[in-house]
Structure formats: structure tokens, C-alpha cells
Amino acid sequence: MYFLSAEERKQLFGGLLPRARSEPVSEELRGWSWHQPPLQPIYDLKLSLFEVANRYCRTGRDLYLRRVLGVETSPNLPMIQGAIFHKTVAKVITTAKRLIYQVGIDDFPEAKRRLSEPDYLSIESFRDRLSQEQIEEIKEKVRVLWEFESTRICSRAEELLASQPRLNEDSLVFHSIPVVVEQKLDGAFLGLSSHLSVDAFTFATPVIFDLKFDVKRDFHRLSPTGYALVMEAMYEFPVDIGCTVYACFKGNRILLERDFYLIDNELRQNFVEERDEKMRMIYEELDPGRPEECYATCPYIQSCKGE
């Protein structure tokens, strides 16, 4: 999911990185300026990053129902599938790293063999919420996803092993799997949860990756923007590039589209405004009202309509 093609690397190094240098972000909108406006939180609240960046409900009434009225709901099928697929991608990447360290480069074929076996444990925590038919369908998609990702990892590793005779395990992991998945972040400086988790991040060229099993939405760029601000607040180095990875299944195939962009002043300002508006709604208990049109998979739709 996070391994770039030659064309994408060219776009990144020849386009976005030079633009990031020539179009600098305002200091006041860097995460390390969390202690002063406009980044300084205006209310003593903590929001999850999803609560800030989510605009599926155009008025944000889902957040009002959850945080002000205390309405509880269960995850629906698209939410469950998304959670399972995210866990699967993270699992195959961490498993590949672990196997390289455990088995070593001299017996890489054994690591490759063991990595070829899909891990279905991510389904177990949702088993009581799914029918047998749904379980089998999701299991097949997990298999396709696991095989897609593990094959790409092994190909990258074998290419490196063939060209670098003095490679060690640590170097192989770094160069063939150059991402950190589910990195834990503390967003407290910015009025966000202390238990954030970013889908993937690359340190060599700081890029925030956000994986979506969804169609493109105009607000999807807000999530990497929020993570970039948090990382800047924690580590005090600039994070200027985001990438939303759109994945979908077509039979036994995975289709991918990666949307790269600068995390510029406009995106940062939009994120801060969204955070402040939602904090105010919760703090002052302001009902934003129902949207003109509800999205089909909203888990709060019955409570929202009073049914």
C-alpha cells in the first residue's frame, strides 16, 4: 500500500519536495507552535483525530449525538471491514519485519514461505457481529490483501539481497520496508487524543500515509494534516507531504490510487477551524441539526431521526 512506483517517486522528489521548499508553511501553523494561536486549543477538551477530520455527516451531528447526548452505537459492516483491512495491512508489514530479524537473510526463502500464510486473526474480534457469509467474504478479501502486500515486500527484499552482498537484517528491513505502521502519537498539545495512531509514516522523506477503503472524499486530506501537526508538535521537524491511499477490491485484485499533496497553510487552517468548531459545539452543547442528506452507512441515523 505504501510502496511507491517509479512514477510516484518522480512526482514526490521532482515535484512536491521542491514545492515544499519554495512554498514554506507559516511558522504559526507548524505543530511546534502549539502553545500559541491559532494552534493553541480554545477549550479544555480532547478530540480524536477522526472526530475532527470526519465530515461524513455534513453538520457534524454524529459527533453531537456521541459526545453531548452520549448516544452509543455499534459499528456497521463498512466500519468493521475497514478496521479488519487496516489491521491486515499493518500485520503483514510487521510480520515481514519480524521474520527477517528472526530467520535472517541467509534463510530468506523460509521467511518468504512463512509470510505467504495469511493471518486471519483480525476477523476474530468481530466474529459475533458478522454472519457466516460475511465472514467468508471478508476472509477472502483478507487473503487477497495479504498476498498482494506480502508479494510486493518479498520482491523488494529479494531485489536488494541480489544487489547488496553485504546487507544485514536491519538494513534489509529499512530499505525494503521503509515505513512505520500504526505509530502511536500524543495529540494532547493540540487538544487531541493522547492515543492517536497513524496508518503509516516514512522517516527518510517525511510522508504521512492514510489508508482508505472508500471512495474519494473532499475532507480526506484533513487526517494526514492533523497527524502532521501532531508529529511536528512532538518531534519539532517539518512534515510537509501527505498521501491518501485509496484501495478497493475488484475480484481477486487490489486496485490502488495514491493522492499526494502538500500539507500547506490552507489545509492546516482548515483542520484548526474544524477542530475549534467541533470543540465549541461540544463545550457549549450546540445542536447543529440534521444535514439535508444523511450518508447511507451512518451508524447514528436512527437516533438522529428519533426512530
Segment roles from a protein language model:
Residues I135-I138, D214-D218, P238:
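Short, surface-exposed loop and linker segments with low hydrophobicity and enrichment for Pro/Ser/Thr
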Residues M1, H175-S194, A233-E307:
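Metal-dependent nuclease catalytic regions and adjoining charged, substrate-binding loops involved
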Residues T202-V215, H220, M234, E257-E266:
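Structural signature of nuclease core domains in nucleic-acid processing machines
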Residues T59, F85-H86, V181, L196-V215, ...:
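Conserved catalytic cores of phosphodiester-cleaving nucleases, focusing on short active-site segments
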Residues M1-S197:
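Metal-dependent nuclease catalytic cores that hydrolyze phosphodiester bonds in DNA/RNA
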Residues Y101, I105, A111-K112, S116-E124, ...:
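A broadly structural signal marking compact, well-ordered functional cores
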Residues I80, F219-L222:
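A generic structural signal for residues located within well-ordered alpha-helices
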Residues L222-A233:
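An active-site-proximal "capping" alpha-helix that borders the catalytic cofactor pocket
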